[in-house]
């Protein structure tokens, strides 16, 4: 089964927030993505609400519950108490925990599982106790994956930023694919499902899914939104689903 596509709405929200206006509509374009075949919607709410606003979460939750109950809501972020309160209020199917400073521009590294296991363990238990699947953002080096499994994570999301950055360097892309494949195999051997995200496009997805056929889900926002400016959401989502099929 091809990996599922979760459309990250942050870039749409950032465009909306350039003006004090309700468009482009985050939920409206999320609806269009789901109608076109996306399996879910992802958001990364940050403390300053510079893209996704806290008020968006209830609207997205209602959209999925009322119109696309088979779809999944994925909320990602650093597990501060404020973030955990938001997550518990809106009950996403999946929570992706990332280690970044809430004020940085974007996630750019995975957890240090060896040093952060004691910090993460009670948080993972808390979320799973509420029925949420937990994915941990991970560098593609397999270091500490056994600790991620031991503290109860269901999945790891492989950080694919370095792979995305090799768009004009085939040799470097091959090296990054080797790293990602090795990391995915290590995670799978431990019983962790594998997600991936960051700078994925219709051009680099086919090679990735060929090397990681067990990939469960990709979360894509920036590249997909850029393509949607040219082709529209329905066509763009269809193109990404085709790319995921290899």
Swiss-Prot record:
Site location (Transition state stabilizer):
157
Q: Which reaction does it catalyse?
A: 3-amino-2-oxopropyl phosphate + 1-deoxy-D-xylulose 5-phosphate = pyridoxine 5'-phosphate + phosphate + 2 H2O + H(+)
Annotated residues for binding of 1-deoxy-D-xylulose 5-phosphate: 46, 51, 106
* Matches recorded under InterPro entries: Aldolase_TIM, PyrdxlP_synth_PdxJ, Pyridoxine-5'_phos_synth
- Its EC number(s): 2.6.99.2
Kindly list the GO molecular function terms attached to this UniProt entry. pyridoxine 5'-phosphate synthase activity
Compartments, record wording? Cytoplasm
Question: What residues does 3-amino-2-oxopropyl phosphate bind to?
Answer: 8, 19, 199, 221-222
* One GO biological process term: pyridoxine biosynthetic process
Which EC class heads this enzyme's classification? transferase
To which pathway does this protein belong?
Cofactor biosynthesis; pyridoxine 5'-phosphate biosynthesis; pyridoxine 5'-phosphate from D-erythrose 4-phosphate: step 5/5
The active-site annotation reads 44 (proton acceptor), 76 (proton acceptor), 198 (proton donor)
The UniProt keywords, alphabetically, are:
Cytoplasm, Pyridoxine biosynthesis, Transferase
Q: Extract the Gene3D superfamilies matched here.
A: Aldolase class I (3.20.20.70)
CDD domains cross-referenced by the UniProt entry:
PNPsynthase (cd00003)
Listed under GO cellular component are: cytosol
Does the keyword Endoplasmic reticulum feature in the UniProt annotation? Answer: no
What protein family does this chain belong to?
A: Belongs to the PNP synthase family.
NCBIfam families tied to this protein: pdxJ, PRK05265.1-4
What does the UniProt function comment say about this protein?
A: Catalyzes the complicated ring closure reaction between the two acyclic compounds 1-deoxy-D-xylulose-5-phosphate (DXP) and 3-amino-2-oxopropyl phosphate (1-amino-acetone-3-phosphate or AAP) to form pyridoxine 5'-phosphate (PNP) and inorganic phosphate.
What protein name does the entry list?
Pyridoxine 5'-phosphate synthase
The organism of origin for this protein: Brucella abortus (strain 2308)
